[in-house]
Amino acid sequence: MKNKSVEMLIEGAKEWGIFLEMFHVEHFQKYYALLLEWNQKMNLTAITEESEVVIKHFLDSLSVVKSGKIKEEEKIIDVGTGAGFPCIPLKIVFPKLKATLLDSSKKRITFLEEVINKLGINEIELIHGRAEDIGKDIKYREQFDLSMARAVAPLNILLEYTLPFVKVDGYFIALKGREIEEEIENSQRALKELKGEIEEVKEIKLPYSDIVHHLVIIKKIDNCPTKYPRRANAIQRSPL
């Protein structure tokens, strides 16, 4: 990456209270290079310009620390991780996180295997599968301190895919856009059914841009009923 983009990354991260060393920067540079290389043969991201990737992928992912819920050595799962956002940037900065990245695309998982090998990232598991299936597996169900999703699905649908992974007293963090009030209003039934409650909604303004988004921080207050998550077609056809 060019010096200007590196400076944007370093200074932007400081706004989240993160102080990057040069080895962190080198990891982000390798990640960016791999993203560009693999994006030529598969659809990973429409955002490829250097400064845009820094702002809309790297700094956006790191903004999760503003939730106050990122703690070293905790177990986290990134549901529908895509090209690795937000979890790979978080693992670069917080290497002791015990991370699981879940995606339904085998091609994207293959890309992520290359990323973690080239970056030398440890304590990370990649799963090729669907959240509605893996969320029923006792190896993963209610095993995580924190789940995250940056997916574009409405919040009430995301909750059914993500909350079953979270331990009681753990958290789900949804990275959502500027307009969030209606989604929250439409998620009240899902929150009640899936045993979650909104603890806080944080407004985040991304550095070097006019982009505003929100972190919706949801606490798991009891075990999810075993009937959730339902099959994907049921979730889409009749969302909670």
From Swiss-Prot:
Major subcellular location class: cytoplasm
Keywords associated with the record: Cytoplasm, Methyltransferase, rRNA processing, S-adenosyl-L-methionine, Transferase
Alphabetical list of Pfam families matching this protein: GidB (PF02527)
SUPFAM superfamilies to which the protein is assigned, alphabetical: S-adenosyl-L-methionine-dependent methyltransferases
Residues that hold S-adenosyl-L-methionine according to the record: 80, 85, 103-105, 131-132, 150
EC nos: 2.1.1.-
Gene3D superfamilies in the cross-refs: Vaccinia Virus protein VP39 (3.40.50.150)
Keyword S-adenosyl-L-methionine annotated: yes
InterPro entries, per database record: rRNA_ssu_MeTfrase_G (IPR003682), SAM-dependent_MTases_sf (IPR029063)
Family: Belongs to the methyltransferase superfamily. RNA methyltransferase RsmG family.
PANTHER family (UniProt xref): S-ADENOSYL-L-METHIONINE-DEPENDENT METHYLTRANSFERASES SUPERFAMILY PROTEIN (PTHR31760:SF0)
Name of the molecule in the record: Ribosomal RNA small subunit methyltransferase G
Native organism: Thermoanaerobacter pseudethanolicus (strain ATCC 33223 / 39E)
